[in-house]
Amino acid sequence: MNQPQDFPPQKSKALWYAQLELGFRFDGQRTIMNHRKHHGPVRVQKMLWPEKTGVCHAIIVHPPAGIAGGDHLTFQVSTERKAHAVVTTPGAGKWYKTNGKQAFQHIYLNIANDSTLEWLPQETMLFDAAYAQSETIIHLDQTASFMGWDMLVLGRQARLETFEQGCYANRFKLYRNHKLLVADTLRFKGKDRWLSSCLGMNGHAVMGSFWAVAPEKYRATLYLEQHIELIRELMMRMDVPVTLTLLDDVVCARFLGDDVRACHDAFAAIRARLRRYWFDLDEEFPRIWRT
C-alpha cells in the first residue's frame, strides 16, 4: 500500500499485530462459521441466528477497543456459495493519539457466487494526533452480493475535540471478477484546508460511506434507479444529509454532518430497504446495536 508522505517514518519492528480470519458457508439449513482463526486480542464475541432464513450474525471485538500507534490490525472474511453473513461490532472503534507512530487497519472481504456479506461496523472515532492508515479491499464473484459501510468521526465530540494534528488515509476498492468497480481514496492532515473547504468536510465532524451490490437479477439500471428514488424520498422524510448515486450497478450513499447517530440511523434505514427489495428479508438490526 502506498504510504502518504505526511506520515513520519516508522520501523516495522515497532508494529503490534492482530489478525482475524473468518469463513462462512451454508450447511443446507443456515449459514455457519466454518473457519475461524485469530492472532492477538481480536476475535468473535458471539454468533446469532435471529432470522428464520438462517442468516448468521457475527459480532467481532477488539478488546483494547481501539488502535494505537504501532498497531497493525487485519480482518479477512470470506463467504461460500449460498451463505449470508452479517458482521458487526459491539461499539465504536477508535484511532488513538499515537505520538507520531503509524497505526494500520486492513480489511479483506471475499464473497463467492450466490452469497451475501453485510459488513456493518459501528463508527470509528479519529482522535486528535492520530496517524492512521486504513484500507478495505473487496472481491466479489459474478453473482455475489454485498452491503457495507464506513462511518468516521473526527475528534471526541463529547470533549469538543477537533482534528488539529495527525494524518488519516483511507483506501477503498471493490472488484467483481477481478474488474475494478469502485476506487475511493481519502487522505488528509490535521488542520488541512480540506476539513473546512466546501469541497471537503465543510467544517463538519462526521462522514460516512455506504456501498451495496445487488443480486445479479436486480442489477438492471431500471430496477436500481427505482430503488434509489424510493430511498431518496425516505432520506428526505428523515431529514438527514445523505446523497445517493449509482456507479454502474453499485449503490453509493454519502453522509456529511455532525451527528453520528443520524448517520447510523440513515444507513441502517437504507440497508433495511435494500434487504426488502433485493432479498425479501426483514430489517433485522443486529441486537448489539440496541445495547
Swiss-Prot record:
GO cellular component annotations of the record: cytoplasm
Major site of localization recorded for this protein: cytoplasm
Source superkingdom: Bacteria
Compartment annotation: Cytoplasm
Molecular function GO labels: nickel cation binding
Keywords assigned by UniProt, alphabetized: Chaperone, Cytoplasm, Nickel insertion
Pfam families, per the entry: UreD (PF01774)
Xref: InterPro entries: UreD (IPR002669)
Role: Required for maturation of urease via the functional incorporation of the urease nickel metallocenter.
Quaternary organization: UreD, UreF and UreG form a complex that acts as a GTP-hydrolysis-dependent molecular chaperone, activating the urease apoprotein by helping to assemble the nickel containing metallocenter of UreC. The UreE protein probably delivers the nickel.
Similarity comment: Belongs to the UreD family.
Protein name: Urease accessory protein UreD
